[in-house]
């Protein structure tokens, strides 16, 4: 499994991408250096991604700050100590709160190893993650990208990526998930860097801030 560990890995991946697909060169020139955005694997990393889903970056960070315990990091055990209605105070949806509770229970019981899962091949890891109720392909893919450092993951169902790829490459219509997954094959084995590139395009050129993790 190719792993992204630092900014140099992102730069290397981008260099390879520009050789694989010259159409990306003007996009890369427009957006500048790509963000690393790595987080530690584990409950907090996955929880942050779930909190960030389908909300603006500012909203996600406000919710996340309210969730952080005063005396340390947000562990599965710490999450389970919150009172049952705490999700309302945090600003979470009930669905997200229920998903986080199920994940926290699995991690705390030892039945789910989120760090070890990152060491598995992408297909196997994605299968385990999406087997958790409330965790869909987007959440699983983004976790492997930003907490596992997997270099060859592309969340083709992400609407921001669909819009960005369609606009940046001058496509006649926004590509849907199946078409975008096929299109992204040319960017393997650095599809996670390609996703960073198009998310950066979405943020800087399309003036939107719904980027998966801060």
Where do the protein language model's features map onto the residues?
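C-terminal accessory module of base-excision DNA glycosylases/AP lyases that mediates lesion recognition
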Residues: 1-34, 98, 122-123, 137-214
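Short, contiguous, helix-prone interaction/anchoring segments in small proteins
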Residues: 41-42
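Phosphate-handling catalytic interfaces
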Residues: 47
